[in-house]
């Protein structure tokens, strides 16, 4: 992977900026690529989706930030998946609309610590791959490995 990134960086330097663009107005390829890869990233997580048993209360804020896996894999048969997790606390305000009371408290949320591209489940993309005729061979890799 490092060799590929180096080769792309060298190619980009040789070719220079695309005509008609000004540095700063267009995000360079390597930066776009670096931001798109499978990695942990700050994500907004709904408190009620994370704690569905708490529907009788109102929370402020209604969502919190947590690191979650996201991004693209080099093959559509792969999915960016969490390989490490931890529990983190976030201080929120719990409002009880029936009693008209509120209090701050710490709630626990799952945060991803490590991510990697792993095969998707048997449904979707992989199921198409399994139905291929053996004479067809494997599908050709898509960009950036064309």
UniProtKB/Swiss-Prot annotation:
Keywords: Disulfide bond, Growth factor, Pyrrolidone carboxylic acid, Secreted, Signal, Toxin. Residues 119-146 are annotated as: Disordered. This is Snake venom vascular endothelial growth factor toxin. One of its GO terms (cellular component) is membrane. It comes from the Eukaryota. Pfam families: PDGF. The keyword Disulfide bond applies. It is found in: Secreted. The modification Pyrrolidone carboxylic acid is found at residue 25. Residues 1-24 form the signal peptide. The keyword Signal applies. GO terms for biological process: induction of positive chemotaxis; positive regulation of angiogenesis; positive regulation of endothelial cell proliferation; positive regulation of mast cell chemotaxis; response to hypoxia; sprouting angiogenesis; vascular endothelial growth factor receptor signaling pathway; vascular endothelial growth factor signaling pathway. It comes from Bothrops insularis (Golden lancehead). GO terms for molecular function: chemoattractant activity; growth factor activity; toxin activity; vascular endothelial growth factor receptor binding. Its main location: secreted.
